[in-house]
UniProtKB/Swiss-Prot annotation:
The modification N-acetylmethionine is found at M1. Its main location: nucleus. This is PHD finger protein ALFIN-LIKE 3. Keywords: Acetylation, Chromatin regulator, Metal-binding, Nucleus, Transcription, Transcription regulation, Zinc, Zinc-finger. GO terms for molecular function: histone binding; transcription cis-regulatory region binding; zinc ion binding. SMART domains: PHD (SM00249). A zinc finger (PHD-type) spans 194-246. Belongs to the Alfin family. It comes from Arabidopsis thaliana.
Length: 250
């Protein structure tokens, strides 16, 4: 396994950051929306396994590269061995921490390989640092920081103000794209900009459809959890993939 190196070699700061975001999105997906499948693939009875995030936003659990040294830095080895010795939350947090370290090592490997100078390395780090870590997304810290930031900016503004109203007048835990719902007040739009997706961890997507989980109250891009506005209209209580998986295993 070469961590997706065969797909392309990013040579500029922007290309390396795009590679970073693709791999990060893939791993966040594995640890959140695809967590049940990821959990099953990490069988402690198997050999040393690694979690790879690929630039095309796909993830895979696989054996480490056979060549020594590998072409790219390798992710943490043997993540499957700790699965049954820790609680699910602790284990996922551990995998997230090691994945964050791996993403940085891959990005700065490219930086060294293509001789980024000091200012380019600094710019790359700042671009990466502006994105929530996988650990923050998986543990909910990113959402907590977002709420804290919103509270500081909006004072004692009620949490319910971030919930828009449907045309029928009933409360709906969804956020429509700006062009589809121009009646959302300015404060709601500010809140939307502060919100981080519970699946991909990004705060962008103000022009996209969002939905909120009724159990954990995290917001998600509709595309990240495969929910369309039309489908959302028929959902009385939405449960995100993580909450659904927890209830299924309980």
């Amino acid at each position: 396994m070469e961590g997706g190196a065969a797909l392309y070699n990013p040579r500029t700061v922007e290309e390396v950051f795009k590679d970073f975001k693709g791999r990060r999105t893939a791993i966040v997906k594995a640890l959140t929306t695809d967590v049940q499948e990821f959990y099953q693939q990490c069988d402690p009875e198997k050999e040393n396994l690694c979690l790879y995030g690929l630039p095309n936003e796909e993830w895979e659990v696989n054996l480490p590269a056979e060549e020594v040294p590998p072409e790219l830095p390798e992710p943490a080895l043997g993540i499957n061995f700790a699965r049954d010795g820790l609680s699910e939350k602790e284990w996922l947090s551990l995998v997230a921490i090691h994945s964050d370290a791996w993403l940085l090592s891959v990005s700065f490997y490219f930086g060294s390989r293509f001789s980024f100078h000091k200012e380019e390395r600094k710019r790359l780090f700042n671009m990466i640092n502006d994105v929530p870590t996988i650990f923050e997304v998986v543990t909910g810290m990113a959402k907590a920081k977002d709420k804290s930031s919103a509270a500081n900016q909006n004072g004692n503004k009620s949490k319910s103000n971030s919930k828009v109203r449907t045309s029928e007048g009933k409360s709906s835990k969804t956020k429509q794209p700006k062009e589809e719902d121009e009646e959302i007040d300015e404060d709601d739009e500010d809140d939307h900009g502060e919100t981080l997706c519970g699946a991909c961890g990004d705060s962008d997507g103000a022009d996209e459809f969002w939905i909120c989980c009724d159990l954990c109250e995290k917001w998600f891009h509709g595309k990240c959890v495969k929910i369309t506005p039309a489908r959302a209209e028929h959902i009385k209580q939405y449960k995100c993939p993580s909450c659904s998986n927890k209830r299924a295993r309980a």
